[in-house]
């Protein structure tokens, strides 16, 4: 699917977010690439979430498994509850080798307050 995006002249995360942040942009990308709008929305939310310092792909996968799929969802979470949920999930699913500390999870939540949310549903 990366090839499809490149053919549509989407070669960077920044460009992708500029286009895929809006419903109309996703519709255009869907038309040009054949990638579904829900999938593009999911990717856009993930890319926006990964703007948070020290929150890479593996931790984003773990957050998603814990029910956090966007910056706005992360903002509303209680750090202790989220960390506990992430631990339980990771014990079963082994998504990350090293669990983030409660301090790091709290910092993600704090840092999420500073992210300008551009992705609309």
Task: Please give the residue ranges for each predicted region.
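C-terminal extensions
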Residues: 1-121
């Amino acid at each position: 699917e990366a090839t499809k995006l490149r053919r549509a002249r989407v070669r960077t995360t920044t460009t992708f977010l500029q286009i895929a942040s809006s419903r109309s942009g996703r519709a255009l990308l869907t038309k040009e690439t054949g990638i579904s709008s829900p999938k593009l929305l999911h990717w856009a939310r993930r890319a926006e979430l990964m703007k948070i310092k020290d929150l890479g792909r593996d931790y984003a996968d773990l957050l998603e498994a814990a029910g956090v799929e966007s910056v706005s969802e992360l903002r509303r979470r209680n750090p202790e509850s989220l960390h506990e949920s992430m631990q339980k999930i990771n014990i079963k699913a082994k998504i990350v080798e090293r669990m983030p500390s409660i301090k790091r999870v709290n910092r993600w939540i704090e840092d999420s307050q500073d992210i300008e949310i551009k992705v609309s549903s």
